[in-house]
A protein has these predicted regions:
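Active-site-proximal, substrate-binding regions of enzyme catalytic domains
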Residues: 2-169
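A two-mode feature
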Residues: 174-175
């Protein structure tokens, strides 16, 4: 809590959770049934979130962590964002440029892994006519391309990076 001119204001900190972090901290336990991730979740003033792709990836690699994550999402302890929800949020600040903005953020995220990653996997988004494409058609194309990316190609990390970039942009625009 922070006091500003006699008023109490809550300062929130945001923690973006990814597949590796959840999986590894869930696997670390004390002598009982207490997981390290549960201790992390007790950190005060934190808001935890992840991209929905993380749920998909955890289901591939870990038996218990997906159940734990689903319970936390259901209890609203962790917010899981889909691409559709991200685009809806972007629409509030970017209007008709929401899809183009998402594509720019996706390209930045892909560039972290390889300068060719975006052109290899998401070329169709770069060539899209953003003055004509609907959000629904954009999401269908994005989903199709994500499926083509497939397993073991850093999709969870890329989606997390996009969510982080867009979250930073939205926070700057609102504050």
């Amino acid at each position: 809590m922070v006091w500003i001119e006699g008023c109490q204001s809550e300062v929130k900190k945001y923690a973006l959770l990814d597949t590796d972090f959840i999986s590894k901290t869930h696997s670390v336990q004390d002598g009982g049934d207490n997981h390290l991730i549960d201790r992390v979740m007790e950190l005060p003033e934190y808001v935890f979130f992840c991209h929905a792709q993380i749920v998909t990836e955890l289901n591939r690699y870990n038996a218990d962590a997906p159940i734990w994550l689903s319970e936390k999402i259901g209890a609203q302890k962790i917010k899981s964002y889909t691409d559709q929800e991200i685009l809806e949020s972007l629409s509030h600040v970017r209007g008709p440029l929401a899809c183009a903005t998402y594509t720019q953020m996706l390209k930045l995220a892909c560039d972290v892994f390889s300068k060719d990653y975006f052109s290899e996997h998401y070329r169709a988004l770069e060539d899209a006519d953003y003055t004509a494409i609907s959000r629904e058609d954009y999401l269908k194309e994005l989903e199709r391309l994500d499926i083509e990316v497939g397993k073991k190609n850093n999709l969870g990390e890329i989606k997390s990076f996009v969510l982080n970039l867009i979250g930073i942009m939205l926070m700057r625009q609102s504050g």
